[in-house]
Amino acid sequence: MIPVIALVGRPNVGKSTLFNRLTHTRDALVADFPGLTRDRKYGRAEVEGHEFIVVDTGGIDGTEDGVETKMAGQSLLAIEEADIVLFMVDARAGLMPADQGIAQHLRSREKATFLVANKTDGIDPDTATADFYSLGLGEVHAIAASHGRGVTQLIEDVMAPYMDAEEPEVELTEEEENAAYWAEQEAQGEDVPPEDPEDDFDPRTLPIKLAIVGRPNVGKSTLTNRILGEDRVVVYDMPGTTRDSIYIPMTRDDREYILIDTAGVRKRGKITETVEKFSVIKTLQAIEDSNVVLLVIDARDGISDQDLSLLGFILNSGRSLVIAVNKWDGMTEEARAQVKDMLDLRLGFVDFARIHFISALHGSGVGNLFESVQEAYDCSTKRVGTSLLTRIMQMAEEDHQPPLVRGRRVKLKYAHAGGYNPPIVVIHGNQVTDLSDSYKRYLMNYFRRSLKVMGTPIRIQFKEGENPFAGKRNPLTPNQMRKRKRLMSHLKKGK
């Protein structure tokens, strides 16, 4: 399970700066949920291969006596939901009473806490951080978030307990070598043997992890119970490691699924709450742990900023996507037409996703969701050989040549699969990293159409070979050597 790191501390100690540094954003608004999360901000981060969710809890002010009151509510909830707490202090301002109050609260929580002294640039970090050892939170990690100094080492120290639990990345160096060989053979007109990468792997033998996410009161629990109440075989309820999320194995149409319910499955007679229980942390973790995300949108409320924030997080995580527009029943034809126009206008950036119009309460359209879920999963895990990807790349190049870069035509050599879920196509060539964004989008869309990929984003990565002449001087020809000798002798005579 992807860990959650919460940033806590007084105002103006640099939490937002560190948040922006970790999430590679500028505005610290990766996923902001007004009215529900107050001043908490959420983002997905990756540092040196370590993936995690980072939460900026906002400034916590107050004294040692009143810190419990100041930390109540949303900020306290963020700390409780986090796996790791980074307690940030200002090295330039020194130890403050509010720091002592926050530290006392954190010590009582028995949470993995790291004391981080920010703004140590331009000063002696040992002298500036000496007073903070009195907080009783162990070693003080000195960083300069604005310049990124010490941030990578901090994350490596924080994530050390999770390194053994992380799944090893799949190395494709052997496939890259094979891809280069067969691309060369094909260029010479030789027959390329049929490929079947990873013969032993059949994604259909694995259950599909389906996360149902959405804003409160859009009908997630109603939809979950409708799914479980129709032609289902529930084997058992297995509480997941995600806080309060429930993992429910089920079978539908001879296909196994694991339903990840972030709202909690309740019996039909107990769905009486007007607003469903909602936790941003649970939602983001469920997205990361899923294969396919089913995003539920309220047709009567339209597309909100919260929906767009969730969509952005889903895209960044690379998960497959199916969109369900709920509460479609009872709407007039005019209202439905307006909703469809709005979807076309605001959801153009996820045109690969199937959109279904359903009524979770009455069950209309619910059965068709699983066809799109299965399609999205199959597309995201489909194995494609190097020769096919290279041929598609060549056809795209023939239809629309790459642009000139510094007077030279970009050369695309070969393509191969670089990963799945989401599908990744790696293109090798010369100057490929200088391709314009528009041409990269053209290649992505061309691969999507050619491979008939639906329901999942597709990513294109570019790799350049090293220039064998980089840093080397061309040897002089014999004629150039004679000219050089004549020039040198002429210069000596002139002296």
Curated annotation (Swiss-Prot):
SUPFAM superfamilies associated with the record: P-loop containing nucleoside triphosphate hydrolases
Database matches in Pfam families: KH_dom-like (PF14714), MMR_HSR1 (PF01926)
One annotated GO biological process: ribosome biogenesis
Keywords: GTP-binding, Nucleotide-binding, Repeat, Ribosome biogenesis
Record-linked Gene3D superfamilies: 3.30.300.20, P-loop containing nucleotide triphosphate hydrolases
Binding site for GTP 1: 9-16, 56-60, 118-121
Keyword Mitochondrion assigned: no
Binding annotation for GTP 2: 214-221, 261-265, 326-329
Keyword Transcription carried by entry: no
Superkingdom field: Bacteria
GO molecular function, one term: GTP binding
Domain KH-like: 382-466
Record-annotated EngA-type G domain positions: 3-166, 208-381
Subunit architecture: Associates with the 50S ribosomal subunit.
Protein family per UniProt: Belongs to the TRAFAC class TrmE-Era-EngA-EngB-Septin-like GTPase superfamily. EngA (Der) GTPase family.
Function text: GTPase that plays an essential role in the late steps of ribosome biogenesis.
Protein name in UniProt: GTPase Der
